[in-house]
UniProtKB/Swiss-Prot annotation:
Pathway: Protein modification; lipoprotein biosynthesis (diacylglyceryl transfer)
Highest taxon, organism lineage: Bacteria
Binding site for a 1,2-diacyl-sn-glycero-3-phospho-(1'-sn-glycerol): 138
GO BP terms: lipoprotein biosynthetic process
Protein name per Swiss-Prot or TrEMBL: Phosphatidylglycerol--prolipoprotein diacylglyceryl transferase
Example of a GO MF term: phosphatidylglycerol-prolipoprotein diacylglyceryl transferase activity
PANTHER family: PHOSPHATIDYLGLYCEROL--PROLIPOPROTEIN DIACYLGLYCERYL TRANSFERASE, PROLIPOPROTEIN DIACYLGLYCERYL TRANSFERASE
Organism the protein comes from: Rickettsia canadensis (strain McKiel)
Length: 259
């Protein structure tokens, strides 16, 4: 199957350009904010709409700074250390989910400390809405023809323009489906059916656990990062970074359900 060659740039006016990738971040944050407000209205956790509104700026900074530094330090440090100015060129791509997640957690901690908000209540809300952004981000990765999968002979293999001429797994779409849509449904079902927000850290634990399981599995189909390759002969960086998430998530689930 030939890649549906979609221009990564939606439109441009002079040097100013709007890309699908940047738009996915904007829409993801707005939809996440809207969904989080609906959750707060229904369940009235120890988070108010005003708290959420005040946190948006912290969240955006955490996502961008954490995501970018995570990519720079974990995936291609030699390039950026030799050309530090490139670190600021986020429009060229290069964001790490694990770095962004850590950035948001740090931002949430600083916010909660300043405004005297319960940290676990806030991170439970964040975890519940994050799959929206994950779904949109992976779709944008697919449009950009980046982060594609390994070579496959299956009928749904796609020839990406930025790779060789071999058909490859559309691993971005696998991630969009499982880390985005399926994970969103799991957390929505847990939240609305089983009222998991009543148990602090349970939604956070569910998110970390299922995201890690999905990511570790889908990495089997995803081409390892060229500048890193395999680690310990068979593991990818994404799998290694997801293992601590799996351990922490499982621990939070056990701790919150046994109380």
């Amino acid at each position: 199957m030939i890649f549906p060659n979609i221009n990564p740039v939606i439109f441009s006016i002079g040097p100013f350009a709007i890309s699908w990738y940047s738009l996915s971040y904007v829409i993801g944050i707005l939809l996440g904010w809207f969904y989080a407000n609906k959750i707060i209205e229904k369940f009235k956790p120890q988070i108010t709409k005003k708290n959420l509104e005040d946190f948006i700026t912290y969240a955006v900074i955490g996502i961008i700074v954490g995501g970018r530094l995570g990519f720079v330090l974990l995936y291609n440090p030699s390039r950026y250390f030799s050309n530090p100015i490139d670190i600021l060129k986020t429009y060229q791509g290069g964001m790490s989910f694990h770095g962004g997640a850590l950035g948001v957690i740090i931002a949430a901690y600083l916010f909660c400390r300043k405004y005297k908000v319960n940290f676990l209540s806030l991170t439970d809300i964040i975890a519940t809405v994050v799959p929206i952004g994950l779904f949109l981000g992976r779709i944008a990765n697919f449009i950009n023809g980046e982060l594609y999968g390994r070579i496959t002979n299956s009928s749904f293999g796609i020839i990406f323009p930025n790779s060789d001429l071999s058909p490859r797994h559309p691993s971005q779409l696998y991630e969009a489906f499982f880390e985005g849509l399926v994970l969103f449904c799991i957390l929505a079902y847990a939240t609305f059916k089983h009222k998991t927000l009543e148990k602090r850290a349970l939604n956070l634990g569910l998110f970390l656990t299922f995201y890690a399981l999905f990511r570790i599995t889908i990495e089997i189909f995803r081409e390892p990062d060229m500048q890193i390759g395999f680690i310990l002969d068979s593991l990818t960086m994404g799998q290694i970074l997801s293992i601590p998430m799996l351990i922490l998530g499982s621990s939070l689930i056990c701790q919150s359900t046994l109380k």
